């Protein structure tokens, strides 16, 4: 069974909080990919400058609000299956789905929330 998993950077929707460094550009790849159930899927996100580990990953399904998967680059949100994992620091980050399942069809995006010291 083939599924299409979208990895999309929603740069225009990134929020600017007081003190946040909103000049940081995020680049996510691939923009889209095709994968099969059981595949290991990796999505990468690169920041234009170092953001330490201030990086979150979200999953969004059509008609639904975004769901937080990972915070602080590698910390799994409560209730999120362990098939999801995050890694990286500085400028390069990855989200990995260890064994893709039909319910994982979604858009995935990263968000930086680095702030000034």
Swiss-Prot record:
A Pfam family name for this chain? V-set
Region Framework-1: start and end of each range?
Answer: 23-45
Q: Where is this region: Complementarity-determining-2?
A: 72-78
Cystine links in this protein are 45-110
Classify the source by domain of life: Eukaryota
How does it associate, per the subunit comment?
A: Immunoglobulins are composed of two identical heavy chains and two identical light chains; disulfide-linked.
Q: Name one GO biological process term.
A: adaptive immune response
Which residues does the UniProt record annotate as the domain Ig-like? 24-117
Residue numbers spanned by region Complementarity-determining-1: 46-56
Q: Where is this region: Complementarity-determining-3?
A: 111-117
Encoding gene per record: IGKV1-16
Cell compartment(s), UniProt: Secreted; Cell membrane
Outline what the protein does.
V region of the variable domain of immunoglobulin light chains that participates in the antigen recognition. Immunoglobulins, also known as antibodies, are membrane-bound or secreted glycoproteins produced by B lymphocytes. In the recognition phase of humoral immunity, the membrane-bound immunoglobulins serve as receptors which, upon binding of a specific antigen, trigger the clonal expansion and differentiation of B lymphocytes into immunoglobulins-secreting plasma cells.
The coiled-coil regions, if any, are: none
Q: Which SMART domains match?
A: IG, IGv
PANTHER family from the UniProt entry: IMMUNOGLOBULIN LIGHT CHAIN
What's a Gene Ontology MF term here? Answer: antigen binding
Tell me where the signal peptide lies. Answer: 1-22
List every stretch annotated Framework-2.
57-71
Keywords, ordered alphabetically: Adaptive immunity, Cell membrane, Disulfide bond, Immunity, Immunoglobulin, Immunoglobulin domain, Membrane, Secreted, Signal
Protein name, per record: Immunoglobulin kappa variable 1-16
Q: What Gene Ontology cellular component terms go with this record? A: extracellular region; immunoglobulin complex; plasma membrane
Q: Region Framework-3: list its residue ranges.
A: 79-110
């Amino acid at each position: 069974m083939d599924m299409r998993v979208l990895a999309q950077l929603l740069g225009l929707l990134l929020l600017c909080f007081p003190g946040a460094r909103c000049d940081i550009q995020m680049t996510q790849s691939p923009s889209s990919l095709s994968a099969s159930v059981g595949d290991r899927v990796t999505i990468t996100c690169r920041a234009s400058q170092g953001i330490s580990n201030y990086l979150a990953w979200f999953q969004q399904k059509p008609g639904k609000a975004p769901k937080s998967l990972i915070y602080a680059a590698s910390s799994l949100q409560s209730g999120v299956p362990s098939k999801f994992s995050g890694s990286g620091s500085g400028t390069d980050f990855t989200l990995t789905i260890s064994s893709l399942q039909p319910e994982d069809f979604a858009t995935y995006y990263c968000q930086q929330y680095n702030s000034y010291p």
